[in-house]
Amino acid sequence: LLYLFIVPPWQHYDEPGHFEHAWLIANRPTLPQPGDFDPAMRRTVAASMIEHDFYRGGAPPDLSQPDPLPIGLSQIDDYVAYYWLAALPLRFLQDADITHQLYATRMVSLLLFLLSIAGCWGAIRELTQPNNSLRWLLPMCLALLPAFADIMTAANNDSAAIAFSTWLIWGIVRLIQRGFSWVWLMGCAIGSVACLWSKTTTFPVVAGLALALPLSLLRGRGRWLVWAVAAATTLFIGATIIQWDDARGWFRASNQEAGVRRAVSQTPVGQYAFALESSAGSGMQIQQVIAPELTEALRGQTVTLGMWGWTDSQEPQSGYLPVLLIATTQGVPDTSSPYQKILLTTQPTYYSITTTLPENTARLWLALTAPVKPAKATTTSTLFLDEISLTKRVANGIDLPGNFVINSSAEFGVVRFRSSWQTPFAQLLRADPNHFVGALLDPHTRSIYISKFMNLSLQTFWARFAWGHVALRNPGLNLLLNFILVSGFLSSSCAVSSQLVANRGNLSIHTVHTLIVLGLISFGVCIAAIARANYILFLGSWFPSARYIYPAVMPVLLAVVGGWVMLFRQITPHHSQPFGEWVILALFASLNIYSLISIVQFYA
């Protein structure tokens, strides 16, 4: 309840947009459609945002400007389950102050917070023996997890997605532990629908039901048939939706049906070349992320961009030399090197251009572009590019040896989602899945991607608040919290593995299957969260990514807390076993109090 009131109005991520969706449902007879807004409501919200110092350090909007007045990212196209619930109290508060209406919406999220804790209690109760301390410890730790409490008391659709996912996990655990039940199957079906109408982050949890149902029906050795079928199905689907014809280290900024890496007989270097298609109304661009240390080395320097280029068309085709996209802050590119147009023929020809980078260059991307043809064009042409180069030029006009471009001749390939699958996966993840796959399979971008995501997700899992910009007063605590999380995971993994190998009697076969399903659900949720975070490669903005992991917060927190319970039982005398549980609870309570102090001091 403290988090609900202690964070100022509108100071949760996208809270104005989430509130707007619920408000439109409450005040209109039909569901809002993308693009809908109420001018008077937006002005009232903007005035409230100004009143509560939302724009401190920035420029507030001019309330007299023409409609639509911006109040943040619109959420009208989001799934509606949360907004239906949030609209219920607003129907009775239509004449109330807009800030009071926001707090009423936050109260709905608070109720969903309580439902999440109840779902966690139900799931751990099914999974453990009556005297197991995790039955009371895990729900209390969840209630005291600061960043989770902050998310679950904000006006946002994550609260519904997390609450419904936690209850569905309870149903999944019960089905596997106790066997098939029509009542619980119906409950899981209702929970699945609620999840699917809440947010796409819940989809891996819903997929877990596809494993739980056959496992609830097969109670003997036949259960392993379920895993065999699941593995075979996964391999078949994987082989169906992916292909190996893109260039490693290069990311699509637009889409074409064919791969961008193609074997060509006349390449100046190697056996492959980049193949970018150009047609009426459609061009193609691929980009490479320049590593931060290379960006720093090139800042303010004169560089040469070069390439070999040709086309498969008998008519000369327009193309561009490589372009450097430049960000002078940690955000998106705000300038670039010149777009130098060239004419390509069937004969491979070398082209180059020299440019000087700004002294304040913060981030760099190298782009290869096939331009859009005129509207009257009826054919599609392929532009072939090879041996892309980025070199530093010294004062006497000589280029230093050493190419800064990775995989400059497309000799190394990488898998990608087929174009027919890329679009639905991108809509599901709100991000291009090929960026995620390409980043993980490229050793040069993998370290950037994973290190930034891990730092981002670990902080936001424990204690990062509001729009992700409010941190603990002492940043050094993050190292301790990360140690606690990783150690808990390792401890629980070792404990479960040792029991499976040394003494199966301590874990029932039902519990083994349940833990596997929970592990797969957590893995799926985390992979989806990592995929959503591919903006790390192209943007510098802060996103509270742990909210994408919270639909699986129950099994994730179980691994952390359960691991530390087992550690304490190894290092404390047998007669003082509850000591470890009380230490863990005290840690969560202390972190919670310190988090509240940090929030109060930030907004003071």
Give residue spans per PLM region.
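Transmembrane-helix motifs of polytopic, lipid-linked glycan transferases
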Residues: 104-128, 167, 491-494
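Extracellular and organelle-lumenal recognition/adhesion modules and their flexible linkers in secreted
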Residues: 229-477
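Specific aromatic-rich, kink-prone transmembrane helix
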Residues: 119-122, 160-178, 186, 190-192, ...
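Membrane-interface alpha helices of multi-pass inner-membrane proteins
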Residues: 184-199, 206
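Transmembrane-helix signature of polytopic, membrane-embedded enzymes
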Residues: 96-99, 120-144
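Perimembrane helix-loop-helix junctions
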Residues: 176-177, 205-237, 502, 507
